[in-house]
Structure formats: C-alpha cells, structure tokens
Curated annotation (Swiss-Prot):
UniProt main location, coarse: secreted
Name of this chain's protein: Major urinary protein 3
Classification via InterPro entries: Calycin (IPR012674), Lipocalin (IPR002345), Lipocalin_CS (IPR022272), Lipocln_cytosolic_FA-bd_dom (IPR000566), Maj_urinary (IPR002971)
PROSITE patterns: LIPOCALIN
Highest taxon above the source species: Eukaryota
Similarity comment: family membership: Belongs to the calycin superfamily. Lipocalin family.
UniProt keyword annotations, A-Z: Disulfide bond, Glycoprotein, Pheromone-binding, Secreted, Signal, Transport
Location relative to the cell: Secreted
Modifications after synthesis and translation: Glycosylated.
Residues spanning the signal sequence: 1-22
SUPFAM superfamilies per the UniProt record, alphabetical: Lipocalins
Transmembrane segments: none
Length: 184
C-alpha cells in the first residue's frame, strides 16, 4: 500500500504534464493568427533527416526574406545560392481544406504547417516533401532578427527530435552566406 501511493502520485504528475503539453499544442492551433506572421524574417536553422537536402548546394537550402499573408495563401520571398550567386525566388503556399496546413510545389510537392511561433521573435515550420515516390521532412526556424537566443534554438532542437530528426542534422544558418546583401 505504501508503494501504491507514490506510484499514483507519479502517474497523476505525468498525466498533468501530458495534458499541459497537449493544451499548449492545441492552443497554438486554436489561437493562431496567421496575419501576425506577415513581414520580414531571417533563416536561422534548417533540419532534415536527409541532411544533403539542406547542406550547401542542397535543393532545399533557402533563405527566407519575407512572408506575405493573403486571403488563402502565404507568399514566401526567399533567396537561393545558384552558381555562387544569390537568386531571388517567390513561392506561394496555398491553404488546404485543413486549417493551418498549406501546400506548394517546389522541388516536389510540399505540405507545411507552422508548429510554433510567438510572432515577434521566431517561427518554427514543419514541411513534408514528396518527389519521385520519396518523402522526407524538413524543419525550419525563422527569426525576426538575424539570430535568436540559445533558448529558442534549444526549443527548435527538441521539436526536431520529436519529429525524428537528430541534432546532428540541424544546420545553424547564422554563420553562412544567407544572401543578406540581396535583401531590399
């Protein structure tokens, strides 16, 4: 009987933590205001279990500059490095039937969602790419400033791990050429 009480208390604590985590996730979806993500952003980090996609010269290595919110879509202005030159590109994410889920065609068919944001500092995006019968996932961390605190980067790393991406596959983009000189 003495052993049962501590086990019950531990179980209650675990259930409380699970409920708090679930509430945090669902309140992000429930209270998400897409208009507030509009504006200038900087690419801080990318992660994928297919690391070559986000390494230098990788097809998914892109540097965001701006997100514009339209009625049923998000317009991303970003830069790629092509032949050692910064090249501006625009991609449009169209809203799906499911709230908060968007799709776009870029290097395959992509669906993406915004997992976490505080609107003023950071945004964390989860993307699933399908091309030629293969699927991979990509996580992106954007900041309103050229760099973010270690706390936010750690939050991103934990979110990547929750999605099966190991820390070694997170690339910090703050120390690479992000085409900042190409920004208007």
């Amino acid at each position: 009987m003495k052993l049962l009480l501590p086990l019950l208390l531990l179980l209650c604590l675990e259930l409380t933590l699970v409920c708090i985590h679930a509430e945090e996730s669902s309140s992000m979806e429930r209270n998400f205001n897409v208009e507030q993500i509009s504006g200038y952003w900087f690419s801080i980090a990318e992660a994928s279990y297919e690391r070559e996609k986000i390494e230098e010269h990788g097809s998914m290595r892109a540097f965001v500059e701006n997100i514009t919110v339209l009625e049923n879509s998000l317009v991303f202005k970003f830069h790629l490095i092509v032949n050692e030159e910064c090249t501006e590109m625009t991609a449009i994410g169209e809203q799906t039937e499911k709230a908060g889920i968007y799709y776009m065609n870029y290097d395959g068919f992509n669906t993406f969602s915004i997992l976490k944001t505080d609107y003023d500092n950071y945004i964390m995006i989860h993307l699933i790419n399908k091309k030629d019968g293969k699927t991979f996932q990509l996580m992106e961390l954007y900041g309103r400033e050229p760099d973010l605190s270690l706390d936010i980067k750690e939050k991103f790393a934990k979110l990547c791990e929750e999605h099966g991406i190991i820390r070694e596959n997170i690339i910090d983009l703050t120390n690479v050429n992000r085409c900042l000189e190409a920004r208007e």
